[in-house]
């Protein structure tokens, strides 16, 4: 699991980081001390669990929690604070738990186990839905090049881009170039994994390595093979929804 700790007190962040490392099972534990850092972190990573203080320097934690809950796939929120008077508001936001400072490892572990149990159920449901969608699509994509037809496994396709009449298909181990238009491939790709982010680009969301803020309030997507593809302004809403930012 990936965790994000949001607190404007360094000591509180350090303590929570230490306790989570003691509990174990976390792939990544990151920290943010304000709203700006939080939004940047949520843009780059998809977190499973967030520890959120109520009192932040630039915004009330309850208000920030409400914004996070509007994401397409919001992380579990655990309020970790010294103030008990916001508990009702927190649970109205469907918070997973509400923990008071000073933190105890057993209490933190109880909250983490709640998230793990819920995540296991959600993952099973999501896998079932993805399998149903995949059943309606071929697992391979036929690509004709020089009188040969290459059968590319869709799971190995990282992204597809077109420029000056040449369509380039990036896979995990090769790059294919063809004169076939991008639209031809878009119709054959599994929408459970692929999304068009620009009139010239289609990406596999499973191969997103990093997302950077770009010019004109757009994003630059860096894929797992290092290729960069820009998100077009008219595609921003769908892209943000696909990575859980709406």
Curated annotation (Swiss-Prot):
Keywords assigned: Cytoplasm, DNA-binding, Phosphoprotein, Transcription, Transcription regulation, Two-component regulatory system
HTH LytTR-type domain segment(s): 141-245
Entries under InterPro entries matching the protein: CheY-like_superfamily (IPR011006), LytR-like (IPR046947), LytTR_DNA-bd_dom (IPR007492), Sig_transdc_resp-reg_receiver (IPR001789)
UniProt modification remark: Phosphorylated and dephosphorylated by LytS.
Modified residues annotated as 4-aspartylphosphate in this record: 53
Response regulatory domain mapped to chain residues: 2-116
SUPFAM superfamilies, per the entry: CheY-like (SSF52172)
GO annotation, cellular component aspect: cytoplasm
Superkingdom field: Bacteria
Subcellular location, record wording: Cytoplasm
Annotated function: Member of the two-component regulatory system LytR/LytS that regulates genes involved in autolysis, programmed cell death, biofilm formation and cell wall metabolism. Also participates in sensing and responding to host defense cationic antimicrobial peptides (HDPs). Upon phosphorylation by LytS, functions as a transcription regulator by direct binding to promoter regions of target genes including lrgA and lrgB, to positively regulate their expression.
Quaternary structure note: Homodimer; when phosphorylated.
NCBIfam families noted in UniProt: PRK14084.1 (NF010684)
Protein name according to UniProt: Transcriptional regulatory protein LytR
Native organism: Staphylococcus aureus (strain MRSA252)
Organism classification: Bacteria, Bacillati, Bacillota, Bacilli, Bacillales
């Amino acid at each position: 699991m990936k965790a994000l700790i949001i607190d404007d007190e360094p000591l509180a962040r350090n303590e929570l980081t230490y306790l989570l490392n003691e509990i174990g099972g976390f792939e990544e534990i990151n920290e943010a001390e304000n709203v700006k850092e939080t939004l940047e972190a949520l843009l780059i990573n998809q977190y499973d669990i967030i520890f959120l203080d109520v009192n932040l320097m630039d915004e009330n934690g309850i208000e920030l929690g409400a914004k996070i809950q509007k994401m397409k796939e919001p992380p579990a929120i655990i309020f970790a604070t010294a103030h008990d008077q916001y508990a009702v508001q927190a649970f109205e936001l469907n918070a997973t738990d509400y923990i008071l400072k000073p933190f105890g490892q057993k209490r933190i572990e109880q909250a983490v186990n709640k998230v793990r149990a819920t995540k296991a159920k959600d993952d099973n449901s999501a896998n079932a839905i993805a399998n149903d969608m995949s059943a309606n699509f071929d697992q391979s994509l036929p690509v004709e090049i020089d009188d040969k037809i290459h059968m590319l496994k869709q799971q190995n396709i990282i992204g597809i881009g077109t420029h000056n009449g040449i369509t380039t298909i990036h896979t995990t181990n090769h790059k294919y170039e063809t004169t076939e238009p991008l639209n031809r491939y878009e119709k054959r790709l599994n929408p459970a994994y692929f999304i068009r982010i620009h009139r010239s680009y289609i990406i596999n969301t499973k191969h997103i390595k990093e997302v950077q803020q770009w010019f004109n309030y757009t994003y630059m997507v860096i894929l797992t093979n290092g290729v960069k593809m820009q998100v077009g302004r008219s595609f921003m809403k769908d892209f943000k929804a696909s990575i859980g930012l709406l």
